[in-house]
Amino acid sequence: MPQPENYQNSTTYFTYPEKVDGVLLRKKYRIRIYDYSDRVIKLERKRKSDSWIYKEDAPLTHEQFDRILAGDYEFLRDSEHQLCREFYVECVCNVMRPRVIVDYEREPWILDAGTVRITFDMNVRAAVGGFDVFDATLPVLPVLEPGKLVMEVKFTEFLPQVVRDLLPGKAQELTSASKYVLCYDKASYLRGFDYWQEGWSVPSL
């Protein structure tokens, strides 16, 4: 495994008004960028079934991201990407709205002989005061204790023994560590803020 390059990961999470507990939520949408750049913008959907996770993504432009934040979803309905069209339905019919921005630095490692990816997420923090993932000036709140990070081990078929042997005994069981939940809970004092006062509207189908 060659020495990886760290990168900044900034993600705006969207959820339903009545479902904010990331532990029970089986489906989450998010818009992700890297290093505060608009070179790559992804709309992602993460589905969870028991301990297994399935991810899909579709590309967005900066202009499209701005339109989504402004509550303009019409372009999603006519997108060539099915994920965008389904996101349109979620926003219009199920009132899906942005809830929190999750920021962190990631160090990725990939095992050459297999489909194993190990990531170390450091300086995990919740951005508050807005949902513009490109705004690097938003205030942030750290969510982890000093000296701690989130390690994720991702694999598609099986976890090689060489990797399993590196993990502490208790970590060899499948567990969930949601950065979304950590950040949402950290910013919980803002829950009295009325999201619907920010110009959000529900467009007609």
Label every PLM stretch briefly.
Residues 1-205:
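Phosphate-end processing signature that detects enzymes handling 5′-triphosphorylated RNA
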